[in-house]
Curated annotation (Swiss-Prot):
This is Ribosome maturation factor RimP. Signal peptide: none annotated. Coiled coil: none annotated. Its main location: cytoplasm. Belongs to the RimP family. Keywords: Cytoplasm, Ribosome biogenesis. InterPro entries: Ribosome_maturation_RimP (IPR003728), RimP_C (IPR028998), RimP_C_sf (IPR036847), RimP_N (IPR028989), RimP_N_sf (IPR035956). GO terms for cellular component: cytosol. It comes from the Bacteria. Required for maturation of 30S ribosomal subunits. The gene is rimP. Pfam families: DUF150_C (PF17384), RimP_N (PF02576).
Length: 154
């Protein structure tokens, strides 16, 4: 089973579990690092999550994963916050984080570049609009966004 298939299946299990606890499932990753496999589940909620939130989801998800036992390898389950550079995955994320600094990568160059950093000004049917520098606005179509995340403000 491919890593993306495992992550997708875990996401299907974890999303309703998180939602029952008032949490948002941001992302699930199944990766190999240094010869060890990690199943990473990133959660959030307005105001941020705490250790109790992570522990509660970790316990329930661990039991559910043991019950279905579809992951063919041993792994370490990690449940945590997405951190300061949280990925932007859903249209709602772009509404929630309007006004924040973001970094967006595109599949193909737009106006000669594939990496954009700026302030998130809004989103709509056509895509995401960010302010680059002082006065330049760029609208990035939804289907061109390969990766987007919040950027740390100093």
């Amino acid at each position: 089973m491919a890593a993306s298939d495992i992550a997708g299946r875990v996401e299907e299990m974890a999303r309703p579990l998180a939602e029952r606890k008032g949490l948002e499932l941001v992302e699930v990753q199944y990766v190999t690092e240094g010869g060890r496999r990690y199943l990473r589940v990133f959660l959030d909620k307005p105001g941020g999550i705490n250790l109790d939130d992570c522990e509660a989801v970790s316990r329930e998800l661990d039991r559910a994963l043991d019950d279905v036992d579809f992951i063919p390898h041993s792994y370490v389950l990690e449940v945590s916050s997405p951190g300061l550079e949280r990925p932007l995955k859903r249209a709602e994320d772009y509404v929630r984080f309007k006004g924040r600094l973001v970094q967006i990568n595109t599949y193909a160059p737009l106006n000669g570049r594939k990496k954009f950093s700026g302030r998130l000004m809004g989103s709509g049917e056509e895509g995401v609009t960010i302010l680059l520098g002082e006065h330049e606005l760029a609208t990035i179509p939804w289907d061109q966004i390969s990766k987007a995340r919040l950027a740390v403000e100093f």
